[in-house]
Regions:
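Solvent-exposed, charged helical/coil patches
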Residues: 1-31
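A short, surface-exposed loop/turn module that caps and links secondary-structure elements
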Residues: 27-55
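Enriched for short, Lys/Arg-rich terminal
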Residues: 3-4, 12, 23, 38, ...
Length: 99
């Protein structure tokens, strides 16, 4: 089973989401990720991967792998802020202490 940790930035983004249905879809997706099923996801380079959520405006979760089974959820966003969110995730990852 995978362990998902959250940055403060990710936690704040998720907490501020007003779309209750989308929030439920995201929580369901994160639950599946703990079981190893990341679904529609791809590596973006620089150690950052993107999990695409097919709900609302196309939500995205940016994460990195830490060790065998630990994943750190870096940043969340949607399609309209994708380029900025990817850069934020990469910058945040660089600023975090190594494993």
């Amino acid at each position: 089973m995978n362990t998902l940790l959250q940055t403060d930035e990710f936690r704040a983004w998720l907490g501020e989401l007003k779309d209750i249905r989308a929030k439920a879809v995201i929580f369901n997706r994160l639950d599946r990720a703990t079981k190893g099923n990341f679904g529609d996801a791809k590596a973006l380079g620089g150690g950052v991967s993107e999990m695409r959520i097919d709900s609302g405006p196309g939500y995205r979760i940016y994460y990195t792998r830490r060790g065998e089974i630990v994943y750190l959820l870096l940043v969340g966003g949607d399609k309209s802020t994708q380029a900025r969110d990817i850069q934020r995730a990469k910058n945040l990852l660089k600023s975090l202490p190594k494993e």
